[in-house]
Amino acid sequence: MQNYKFLKDINFPSDLRKLSENDLQEVSNEVRKEMIDAVSETGGHLGAGLGVVELTVALHYVFDTPNDRLIWDVGHQTYPHKILTGRKSKIKTLRQGNGLSGFTKRSESEYDPFGAAHSSTSISSALGMAEANKLSNKLNNIIAVIGDGAISAGMAYEAMNNAGASKTKMIVILNDNDMSIAKPVGAMRTYLAKLLTGKIYFSLRETFKLIVSAFSKRFSVKAGKAEDFLRSAVTGGTLFNSLGFYYVGPIDGHDLSTLIPILKNARDSKHQGPIMIHIKTQKGKGYSYAEKASDHYHGVSKFNVVTGEQVKSGTNLPAYTKVFANTLVKHAERDSKVVGVTAAMPGGTGMDIFAKDFPKRMFDVGIAEQHAVTFAAGLATEGYKPYVAIYSTFLQRAYDQVVHDVAIQSLPVRFIIDRAGLVGADGSTHAGSFDITYLSTLPNFIVMAPSDEAELVKMTNTSMTINNKPCAIRYPRGNGIGVELPSIDENIEIGKGRVIQEGKQVCILSIGTRLEECKIAAAELKNKGIESTIVDARFAKPLDQELILKCAREHEAMITVEEGSIGGFGSHVENLLSEKGIFDKGLKFRTMILPDIFIEQDSPKKMYDVAGLNASQISKKILDILFTKESIKVVKN
């Protein structure tokens, strides 16, 4: 840590509160420097945290955290919060194995009263805490901080609707930086822009600051006529007022001389109901490279602080995301019915590539996964070919729509599921562990998992031909293995796997990108005199029953390997073998799946070590099946 004037002596917010208000801007500057220094070494979310440094300092200065509950939506903006709440010495372990989480986490600190990583949960959880306090006759404050992107999601509207009718005091800080990950979209964004650019805001901005300063003592003591005047003068009627919120703003979120008295006023207010404080901030504030390109500095790899240059991956292998996007563009050039849908993640899913060539056929619906799925279903009813590109972890948020609006109606929506399996530094909140399970259980679904980038191209090609039911293609974060890519005319037969190599004793059924580990495991077994058949199953649904049953009858043992949880591919294979009476004939069988735990952040390789799904663990499992007395074996009568 640098030799800071103030930060060196701040370990907890109680230390911060000992300082004069006049010192807080320098504290903010030091926190900002420390954050930039840390993220330059660890990588992580940079821009969002830089934009809320002053807000973070002000909140911990004004409120009695952790007794007062401070809830951050999403949590990727909480690095300054972590620096000020007892985690300063560990800040350079962010997103590392056994290090600090990149998000808020209840088990990490009492200053994190609610864990986060997915968006739009803060107002709901804050309202729950506020109602609990009312029932318990507690007087502590509950504060939720939510961004302009996250507040556009349906869950946030549901929470505001409930909060406005509750007459329960809570404080919501709307952090408006005009940039969630990609630029926010939709009517809410337009509405907030009008609030920020209207004549009232600009003409009264300085006047507002002066009045707050003049009445600062009165503001800190009680709400009065000055507060009522400011509220009516600055806001007039707003959507938030209509929802039952006492709305103040918009105000400059980097101006501590304005923030602190307004937060004190909200803290001390006797208003019975929710209070909304709308602040305007700049994502990437204080670091010129992040200010100029805030979308590219949302999440960063390690970087040079002086030049802003990020460390490149050092590989020329194509990313799965880009392989899919480029393949879809080629199909869209041929077929005008191809359309893209994403939920506020065009860059992460590769749909920004599609949008450059087909802007009118690309729909970014914002942080609205439920809407995205049903919107795509509507497109499908009119003969279009919607591709919903979404992270596995975020598709979970729209499961009812997948079932009710897509699967039951057998609509040909194509789900392109990125970040399947274990994802590394973002940890358990972003892992794609469950999609094979929750999609393969649905009637009318086709579920595919490519073993490499060439297979991804073939599956994307094949999805173009599926016009009577939904399908899904799931693939991991990261790069392929360097195989040659096929043309867009090369399809695969639905429900048919492929044999990679043939042996006599054991059959390894792999689905997805664990195939390379299975090959290494088979080589290890060969050195021990054990011959293995390897099958790339390709499809979790429908299963290649003919191939699976043939392999089961011709081998002493069979093992399935997948990057998914219980109830997925292996469970469906086991059910097939049971129904066909294969176990009655003595087959030794095991499934290798993700364990029944949430695996914490680390490198993907280390996470798969924890999961028991790397090559040496696969070969050991097979040896156990073949040679231990405890192996599962159903003997003939």
UniProtKB/Swiss-Prot annotation:
It catalyses: D-glyceraldehyde 3-phosphate + pyruvate + H(+) = 1-deoxy-D-xylulose 5-phosphate + CO2. Binds 1 Mg(2+) ion per subunit. Binds 1 thiamine pyrophosphate per subunit. Transmembrane segments: none annotated. It comes from the Bacteria. Keywords: Isoprene biosynthesis, Magnesium, Metal-binding, Thiamine biosynthesis, Thiamine pyrophosphate, Transferase. Pathway: Metabolic intermediate biosynthesis; 1-deoxy-D-xylulose 5-phosphate biosynthesis; 1-deoxy-D-xylulose 5-phosphate from D-glyceraldehyde 3-phosphate and pyruvate: step 1/1. Its cofactor is Mg(2+); thiamine diphosphate. Thiamine diphosphate binds at H76, A117, H118, S119, G149, A150, N177, Y287, E369. It is an enzyme of class 2 (transferase). Its EC number is 2.2.1.7. InterPro entries: Dxylulose-5-P_synthase (IPR005477), THDP-binding (IPR029061), Transketo_C/PFOR_II (IPR009014), Transketolase-like_Pyr-bd (IPR005475), Transketolase_C (IPR033248), Transketolase_CS (IPR049557). The keyword Metal-binding applies. GO terms for molecular function: 1-deoxy-D-xylulose-5-phosphate synthase activity; magnesium ion binding; thiamine pyrophosphate binding. One of its GO terms (biological process) is 1-deoxy-D-xylulose 5-phosphate biosynthetic process. Mg(2+) binds at D148, N177. Homodimer. Belongs to the transketolase family. DXPS subfamily. Catalyzes the acyloin condensation reaction between C atoms 2 and 3 of pyruvate and glyceraldehyde 3-phosphate to yield 1-deoxy-D-xylulose-5-phosphate (DXP). HAMAP family: DXP_synth. This is 1-deoxy-D-xylulose-5-phosphate synthase. It comes from Pelagibacter ubique (strain HTCC1062).
